[in-house]
Amino acid sequence: MAVTHSVGDMLTKIRNASRVKHESVDLKMSKINRSILDILKEEGYIKNYNIFDKKGIPFIKAMLNYDGKRNPAINRIDAISTPGRKVYSSYKNMPRIKNGYGILIVSSSKGVITGKQAKDNKVGGELICSVW
């Protein structure tokens, strides 16, 4: 079965791997997936990621981050926009996630950025996901 929503598939794989405390998870390579992982790495939700080929198909191996007691850094990761329901927001109406403790990932004209960066740059865009 073909995956029609690569971002949703990636978020589900990260959520499931985090809940069962896997060290890493293999994800399909795409530009938007890589941009989202850059933000997750910058914000400390994942340790790192590497790109590798499996039978000529590019994949990403994301190393998940845990605290000293093996509690996952990602408590919840949810897709906001889906292929059937795109959600957009202006920078003025950008929602806060967990009163500022979580992050919002936005696809804007400036690229894939956090909700805070979107507010600072005064750009709106498609709300991809929330993480906390």
From Swiss-Prot:
InterPro entries: Ribosomal_uS8 (IPR000630), Ribosomal_uS8_CS (IPR047863), Ribosomal_uS8_sf (IPR035987). PROSITE patterns: RIBOSOMAL_S8. GO terms for biological process: translation. Keywords: Ribonucleoprotein, Ribosomal protein, RNA-binding, rRNA-binding. GO terms for cellular component: ribonucleoprotein complex; ribosome. It holds the Pfam family Ribosomal_S8. Transmembrane segments: none annotated. It comes from the Bacteria. GO terms for molecular function: rRNA binding; structural constituent of ribosome. Belongs to the universal ribosomal protein uS8 family. Part of the 30S ribosomal subunit. Contacts proteins S5 and S12. NCBIfam families: PRK00136.1. One of the primary rRNA binding proteins, it binds directly to 16S rRNA central domain where it helps coordinate assembly of the platform of the 30S subunit. This is Small ribosomal subunit protein uS8. It comes from Borrelia duttonii (strain Ly). The gene is rpsH.
